[in-house]
């Protein structure tokens, strides 16, 4: 009966005898909005799925309520690709006064660390023990990315010292060797952690990796075991399986929106450093790549000594290394992430691991996680960092393994 009533109203409104079409358009618009809102409230807001071993699960439920609370994605852009795109287009850029430091690497390369700190923190008046948040941006990102600026801003507000590890060449500096960076090679990250721990040996250190940076954090933890020098790790939108990632990015729409623009940016980095790279490979051939897979085949796998792209992807995928991780790490992923498909997440391995927890939201895209009607400022990622950092810095005794050793301790 309700359906017949609505049909009669529409027919009556659309009838020429009843005057203009404006009433019909208004009715259709109202009906469309009602259906949209009904769908949103019925299907979109959901509690995230938290997968972890018993001790880590209890720790997170007690100290990080965001892990069990309903996530409300932005009403007008909750689809994964829209979340990914609008995060880039809409988010503000906090002004962060960085202090840059150049680090030299054992192989003759260089990269930049960008430090951010408050002159005095009421949370931690002793600067030698002030907690440090180490941030690792995405594949072509730097300390200037809006999502990094917001996370740094959050860390500073919470009273921590923040430092951003910029991969080689990502802040415009020249490559001194043919190698830029790759997801399987954690040598530069090891250099960073040792440098920080040497300077601030008494300060607890939390590594936060976003996207590509998250892969580095996971591979670093798997490689170093209990000697990683971190109290904990946090990853956001990390890609767990490189094969699944490139397959997803090569679907038509994802290729147009993400794969091609990202590849073009990476090719510019290679072309800009032709002088150093052309000694070991054909730069002209490499920069003709139109996909991430092609560039990895022509440049990354060659520069880092892999037989081919498949060998590199096998080495770079953290999915198979969960058992080797011995430092607590919380991993935030969205089920609709176009870069990291949900089927790539190591659910069973995380459930058995004492140290790895997966926090999976139904929506959020890739480095999106926008929430609220006006998502210009902080988002879900900031809330996760705020609560998790506070938990690991203030309640580390409750973490699995009771914290981590320093790199120096691991050698003894």
Swiss-Prot record:
The chain crosses the membrane at residues 24-44. SUPFAM superfamilies: alpha/beta-Hydrolases. Its EC number is 3.1.1.-. It is an enzyme of class 3 (hydrolase). GO terms for biological process: medium-chain fatty acid biosynthetic process; medium-chain fatty acid catabolic process. It is a single-pass type II membrane protein. Keywords: Glycoprotein, Hydrolase, Membrane, Serine esterase, Signal-anchor, Transmembrane, Transmembrane helix. It comes from the Eukaryota. GO terms for molecular function: acetylesterase activity; monoacylglycerol lipase activity. The active site is at residues 211, 337, 366. GO terms for cellular component: membrane. Residues 131-372 form the AB hydrolase-1 domain. It is found in: Membrane. Glycans are attached at residue 18. Belongs to the AB hydrolase superfamily. AB hydrolase 4 family. This is Protein ABHD1. The lineage of its organism: Eukaryota, Metazoa, Chordata, Craniata, Vertebrata. The gene is Abhd1.
